[in-house]
Every structure is written in C-alpha cells, then in structure tokens.
C-alpha cells in the first residue's frame, strides 16, 4: 500500500525516549502511517511496536546511521517520508502542515 506520508522511526537499542517519540507521532492531528526500523532488534522495541500497533522492519548487518536511515527510507511506502530519530518529538500539527 502506498501512503501519503510515513514516519519511519529509526530505533537503536533500548532508548528510553522511543515511547515518547511514538506518542508524539500517534498524537498527530492528521494521522500518518508509522513504522519502526532498526538494526538492533530487541524485545523492548517489539513490546512498544505491539503496544502501538506498529510494524518493525529489521535491517541485517552492522549498525550504522547512514545505512540504517537509508533502510528506513526504503521501507517506508509513502509519497512523503519523515525519518524520525528515536529521541525526536513532533508537534501535533507536523503532518497537517506537511500535507
């Protein structure tokens, strides 16, 4: 499925900020599709994904910011893609203003 806008959240290990990031994306006034992308899969990331109904995309190979972010972009099936880092917080009108 091709979405108008996708947030691709890059998650690295067990960041204590990841849930706050996800909450800010789920609170958008105009909803966007959200995926979590990681090269460091963990039960912590899986639990948050399950809690918020999000898909987890796992990149094989060594972790590296360039390759991880390119992977996240490639996994997002959208006309517009926002790469969200695990400690980013987005204003609730971000998607509305973007679209």
Spans of features found by a protein language model:
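Active-site regions of enzymes building and remodeling cell-envelope glycoconjugates
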Residues: 50-58
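Glycine-rich, basic loop-to-helix element that forms the pyrophosphate-binding segment
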Residues: 60-76
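N-proximal low-complexity "stem/linker" segments adjacent to membrane-targeting elements
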Residues: 1-24
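Short, acidic, metal-binding catalytic loop of nucleotide-sugar glycosyltransferases
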Residues: 23-32
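Acidic donor-binding/catalytic loop of UDP-sugar-dependent glycosyltransferases
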Residues: 88-99
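Short aromatic/hydrophobic "clamp" motif used to bind/position activated sugar donors
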Residues: 81
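A conserved acidic beta->alpha catalytic loop
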Residues: 37-45
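Active-site acidic Asp-centered loop
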Residues: 39, 84-86
């Amino acid at each position: 499925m091709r979405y108008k806008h996708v947030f691709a959240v890059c998650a690295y290990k067990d960041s204590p900020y990841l849930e706050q990031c996800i909450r800010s994306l789920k609170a958008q006034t105009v909803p966007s599709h959200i995926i979590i992308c990681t090269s460091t899969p963990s039960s912590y990331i899986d639990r948050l994904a399950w809690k918020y109904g999000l898909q987890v995309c796992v990149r094989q190979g060594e972790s590296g910011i360039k390759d991880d972010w390119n992977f996240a972009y490639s996994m997002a099936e959208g006309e517009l893609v926002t790469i969200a880092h695990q400690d980013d917080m987005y204003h609730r009108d971000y998607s509305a203003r973007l679209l």
